[in-house]
């Protein structure tokens, strides 16, 4: 038990953020119910089956310096199973593949002049030395990068890289985004590691999530899968949650981990100004193609694409990181299409996505044949990450909502990092003290109350 009263918590959303929040609250002695609309936990980190292979639905990697992810892995007795690998990085520029995996290869990179290379390196170094990231929130990322790198390097390198993650939304994104990206790359040095390495768990994130779910159950968390939430409301000191099965349950405290655009729909009692702030947050979406191939495309884990005629925004060859035995000896690649949440790409059929993807691969890899394709699937997610627009952190709605007993903890609150599993877990961990403080100060009952079914 803790110094707070035992309360009944509802966590809405069973991604890694919701799972971590549920675990920590349960470990503090509270009763926790975790609601998830899909048939499995994990959210963006969940697994699916591609042909005869089960692996992550979206591409993920763990860095040696990802301390929050590794803390969870240690709790699940999985950290010692991690495999750590040095990977190579490629650039597809001017119709050719180039390796950019070492300082020497960077110096030999012909598409950039020696001066441009110097300015590019200086930009990254300058970004790594910035301590107060908030100063960058008032400047567009394109303006900041052109100031340091010059227009030519921006057009040749930075702009395609920005578009690979942000699409046309890069035009409204603040320079804090690139600071966070550079900070993640320099995390290893800041934590005293000699070099950064990429890691994977044999069995993928699906294995971690399976163990995580068991850990939650052992901690006493009540997991409700296939339960969409229709509404959340406050009445007479309790928070009532109505699910898709028309059942209404009362809790002492509720935490929403859903995207901000969903919050006002679930919470009609939210103050108008607060609801408007949630609605104003723009999200970047993704159509993420998974392909199982008979053979590898190249030996690069990530290939950044700077040619505008390729439809997808990068090539991630997971089998350049993960031992091919995990994929029955085949190659697993991801082709991301990062697009705004209202983009027409979400209406493309699987056949249309497949054809575009195959044409793109044929334009990049002369040895690629359509006969190499073993299996194909496409994941579509409209709200992946919030766009860090100008002065983004100043416009965020508070975590503690205007509705008593209801909190929002979602990835839109990641203001000084990039969206990844480590930052998601970090967000959950940092939210717990505030959740407990509010619970302690609330007018919760002196003795535990059973969940009320209405």
Predicted region positions:
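N-terminal Rossmann-like FAD-binding beta1-loop-alpha1 element of flavoenzymes
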Residues: 7-34
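Conserved Rossmann-like nucleotide-cofactor binding loop
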Residues: 17, 40, 261
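Glycine-rich FAD pyrophosphate-binding loop
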Residues: 26-50
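Dinucleotide-binding Rossmann-like beta1-alpha1 core, especially the glycine-rich loop
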Residues: 51-133, 160
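Active-site/ligand-binding neighborhood in enzyme catalytic cores
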Residues: 112, 122-235, 250
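Mid-domain catalytic core of redox enzymes
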Residues: 227-347, 351-368, 379, 393-402, ...
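Short FAD-binding loop at a beta-strand-to-alpha-helix junction that anchors the flavin cofactor
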Residues: 333-334, 398-417, 423-427
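Internal hydrophobic alpha-helix adjacent to the cofactor/substrate pocket in enzyme cavities
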Residues: 424-443
